[in-house]
From Swiss-Prot:
Keywords: Disulfide bond, Lipid transport, Signal, Transport. This is Non-specific lipid-transfer protein 3. It comes from Pisum sativum. Belongs to the plant LTP family. Transmembrane segments: none annotated.
């Protein structure tokens, strides 16, 4: 519970910073809601598998970002969230979309340059 609250606070703070720049109807709250079931997977050892609710959230997130601006905003939220999880398994974060059958042309990472997303 404390972990979820910490993640929620970090994502909310980052949303307030990123939202004015994104010019998108997309919300970081969407990221938090959709990816909350993934927290255990993101902190797990390598070769873990995301849960079905986690993958459902990843697919919902992809569907919620239909425009380039939305995708850039989603990327910025993912980037901020990845940087805020102290025991994040970077390999699991990068593998998450593929393990859930979602194709995105960037890795979920604290170092992703979201401004280059044009798909």
């Amino acid at each position: 519970m404390a972990r979820s609250m910490k993640l929620a606070c970090v994502v909310l703070a980052m949303c307030m910073l990123v939202a004015p720049m994104a010019e998108a109807a997309f919300s970081c709250a969407t990221v938090m809601t959709d990816l909350r079931p993934c927290l255990t997977y993101l902190e797990a050892a390598n070769n873990a598998s995301p849960s079905p609710p986690c993958c459902a959230g990843v697919k919902n997130l992809q569907a919620a970002a239909p425009t380039v601006a939305d995708r850039q905003a989603a990327c910025n939220c993912l980037k901020s969230t990845a940087g805020a999880i102290s025991n994040l398994n970077a390999n699991n974060a990068a593998a998450l979309p593929g393990k859930c059958g979602v194709n995105i042309p960037y890795k979920i990472s604290a170092s992703t340059n979201c401004n280059t997303i044009r798909f």
